[in-house]
Every structure is written in structure tokens, then in C-alpha cells.
Design a protein with these regions (language model features):
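Metallo-beta-lactamase
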Residues: 2-102, 107-109, 115
């Protein structure tokens, strides 16, 4: 039996309220989501990643699967602040080894921290 912190009926997503929809729409109007410079910047220095994008224990059990974040490829739903959605896209979609500057390397997106 899988552990769930919430009963099944409470664990299901709910539609955004009208207030939430209006609030998210204001964020979309205030920020320039057509500017993709952040995505270009995040890709700079990319060297390599792993394929498939999963991390496994020696026994083969998957401990981390970035494929589970593929839902972020789309637009933010009305229930999510579009600015936070964009930040999640930047974090999840740019994974692997990067050279930040000469001789300084960074591993990104294989956990919540950068190493």
C-alpha cells in the first residue's frame, strides 16, 4: 500500500477559482513571457546530460526521474502562478553538466540544489 498524506478525494486537483484566474492573468499581463532570454542564458555552457534522465541505485531502482517533470513543457495552468511555472521550467528543463566559466563546472537539476 502506497503512503499518501491526503485522502484520495483531497489529493485530486481542483479547478482555479475566479479570483485565482484573475490573479494569474494579472501576472501574465505584468511580465513579458515572450522574452525567452532566460532560457537561452540557462542553456549557456551546457556540456552533457544523462539519457535517460533518471538516476538509479545499484539495484536498478529509480530514485530520481526528471521525466516526471515533463508536464512543465506546457503553459502554466490557471491554478499556478505563471512566474513560478517559468522558474520551474528553467530548473527542470536545463539539466546536466555546465561550464559556468573557465574551469568552473556545475551540475544542474538532478535535485533541488545546484552542485
Amino acid at each position: 500500500m502506497a503512503y499518501s498524506p491526503l485522502p484520495a478525494d483531497l489529493a485530486q486537483p481542483k479547478p482555479a477559482t475566479e479570483h485565482t484566474k484573475k490573479t494569474q492573468a494579472r501576472v501574465r499581463e505584468q511580465l513579458n513571457f515572450d522574452d525567452r532570454q532566460s532560457f537561452d542564458d540557462a542553456q549557456r555552457g551546457f556540456i552533457a546530460s544523462i539519457d535517460p534522465i533518471t538516476i538509479k541505485r545499484p539495484d536498478g531502482h529509480i530514485t530520481f526521474d526528471l521525466e516526471q517533470l515533463s508536464f512543465l513543457h506546457g503553459e502554466a495552468p490557471d491554478t499556478v502562478n505563471p512566474s513560478l511555472w517559468r522558474q520551474a521550467q528553467l530548473n527542470a528543463q536545463h539539466h546536466g553538466l555546465y561550464e559556468v566559466c573557465d574551469g568552473l563546472y556545475q551540475v544542474r537539476s538532478f535535485d533541488i540544489a545546484n552542485m
